[in-house]
């Protein structure tokens, strides 16, 4: 028979390791077995916020103002994480997401995506049946502000080629970092290009496959 003290010690070690690893795992708030429909455009509705969201950071603070309710269902084609600049303190991850025909495996061979320095880039083959206007209007580089730590943990688990659903708000951000004023504005259209054309999303709910996180 195993000594009680030895058993208690082994159980304690197992429990400690379980708690340690669970700290980095997102906790599901629910399950949704309906198919994530990537064929439709994002849903955007005007929104006027009476109470901006304030985030305090070391050597700074941000005021986040929602300007539109937003829901995006699509396919992740690239993911980039950041940690070195002031932006990363509030938005540590960018997701390049496509929808419509771009999310159809039939067209994957024609268009490729990449990210760098808070930008996303695409390349398409000459024989592609999808022109640049379609590609631009059915893809977006999304700067993600997780509303909760749990959502932030869930976002870290997202992999390329996964279907996701993001719900929350398009937001504008103003504040200071290191004593310097900072501003970050969201795009409100899917048809713009260049500087300022990315969406800044305050995510209040994320669905990855069938798992829902809040």
Language-model segments: which ranges?
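OB-fold and OB-like single-stranded nucleic-acid-recognition modules
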Residues: 3-10, 17-214
């Amino acid at each position: 028979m195993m000594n009680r003290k030895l058993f208690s010690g082994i159980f304690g070690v197992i429990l400690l390791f379980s708690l340690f690893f669970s700290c980095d795992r997102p906790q599901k708030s629910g399950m949704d077995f309906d198919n994530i429909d990537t064929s439709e455009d994002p849903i955007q509705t005007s929104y006027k916020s009476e109470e901006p969201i304030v985030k305090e950071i070391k050597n700074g603070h941000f005021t986040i103002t929602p300007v539109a309710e937003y829901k995006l269902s699509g396919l992740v084609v690239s993911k980039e994480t950041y940690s070195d600049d002031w932006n990363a303190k509030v938005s540590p991850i960018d997701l390049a997401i496509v929808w419509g025909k771009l999310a159809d495996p039939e067209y994957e061979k024609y268009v490729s995506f990449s990210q760098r320095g808070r930008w996303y880039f695409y390349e398409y083959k000459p024989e592609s049946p999808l022109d640049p206007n379609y590609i631009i209007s059915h893809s977006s580089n999304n700067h993600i502000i997780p509303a909760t730590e749990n959502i932030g943990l869930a976002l870290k688990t997202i992999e390329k080629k996964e279907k996701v659903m993001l719900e929350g708000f398009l937001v504008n951000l103003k504040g200071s970092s290191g004593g310097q004023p900072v501003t970050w504005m969201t795009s409100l259209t899917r048809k713009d290009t260049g500087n300022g054309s990315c969406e800044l999303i305050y995510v209040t709910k994320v669905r990855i496959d069938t798992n829902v996180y809040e």
